[in-house]
Amino acid sequence: MKKLYILLTVIIFSSISYSQFNQYPRPGQGQFTGGAGITWIDGQPNYTIALQPEVSFANWGVGLDLRLTFDPQGNLRKESFNDFSDYLSIIRYVRYGLKNDPVYIKLGALDYYTLGHGTIMYRYNNSPSFDNRKIGLVTDIDFGDFGFESIYSSFGEAGIVGLRGYVRPLHYTSWRAIPIISNLELGLTFAGDFNKNAGITAGQYNNITNKFESTTDKGSINIVGLDVGLPVISGSFADVTLYYDFNKIIDFGHGSATGVIAQFNPLGFVQASAKLERRFNGDHYIPSYFNSFYEIERFQITDKTTGSFTSKAALLAGLSNNDDGWYGELGVNALGLLNIIGSYQRLDKTPNSGILHIESEIAPEEAPFVLRAGYDKINIRNEKDLFTLDDRSYLFTEVGYKPYPFMVVSLVYNWTFTPVRDADDNIIGYEPQKRIEPRVYFVFPFSFEGS
């Protein structure tokens, strides 16, 4: 297992933490972070320079993320710019609007993106590695009577394409004025992965050529789905939607799900969200196939000497016994001081089917401290397996103190992934990577609106 230890003397940038909390500056405001430091990689000192400005104005937002790491000889670390997408990833994001706004467009890193009710794509992340950041595009537009959601995961290589179109058919009838039932929504979804490794189910690693040679390849993985949703409560106090989805993975199996999504704002200063879903899975079917770990799960070499590998397509092909399951999620935001969200899913009869996601943040604007944490784990076997760190885990923690309002002294720990490449520099998998960062950083907020 490769270990990467980082000590930053004066470093002024924040990590890629995939947090959903406080993602962007408020409209008319921005912040500039940047700095330089020393990084130890495999016992050798490397030198890091980083610039990360971010600004929001009206519905627009822009964030950049330039990170340069040089080895002791002054050469740029090759992992920093292996692919064309590495150059594009300097643009962390350009966006218009926010998710669930009438118009939402985002170009860049895609963190936790969901199509529809999430039974095909849920919390998908296109950049799970510091050394393999990607740039993609999402476009969601709601015209009132109809609309669509879409995603293109990466401009640097073939990847995931997804599109969900939906219509509110009763808006075209005399029932338009009837509360509740008039907002009935029907949707149709297509999502496919066109990456060259998406459909590999059998093969072997050639140690002479240092390349993986597939013997069975199903090609692209394509999923189509139909869904119906009904908002039974809609207002400032609460929003509650009932839904039913049916999905088919082409050349594999099918499944369905029914559930409820709710958001509550009863007192104004406490907000809560919840989701509960019952899943009915047929043979050769995986719900929420494109999840937050999909870029890791898609394909990876686990042992070059034996040629063993794992792929999601191989897992899909091997699921011969249907197994139903549950998914639950709960989130709370209290006074803007405490944010926490957690979710867990498991199949009824499959022992290693648990998937856990937790993230939390305590970062009051006026308080002298910062606490952040995020944790994801897949293929959980039992309760003892929940919090063991391995190649099925992602962890981010930050504990910080603010001696001044613009200065944070913190310790950051990341258990993430680094890409493994073959002789032709193609990514053939990922391996766990540890990053420890004692950090001093400065955040300079600014405003460009008139007083």
Question: Which role fits each region the language model picked out?
Answer:
Residues 21, 27, 31, 44, ...:
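Signature for the C-terminal beta-barrel architecture of outer-membrane proteins
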Residues 89-104:
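Gram-negative (and chloroplast) outer-membrane scaffold detector with strong preference
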Residues 369-372, 394-410, 443:
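Conserved C-terminal beta-signal and adjacent last beta-strands/turns
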Residues 15-19:
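Sec/Tat signal peptide C-region and signal peptidase I cleavage site
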Residues 62-93, 120:
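Surface-exposed loop and membrane-interface regions of Gram-negative outer-membrane beta-barrel proteins
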Residues 4-14:
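Sec-dependent N-terminal signal peptides
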Residues 94, 165, 430-451:
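Outer-membrane beta-barrel "beta-signal"
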Residues 20-54:
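Short glycine/proline- and aromatic-enriched beta-strand/turn motifs that initiate or cap beta-hairpins
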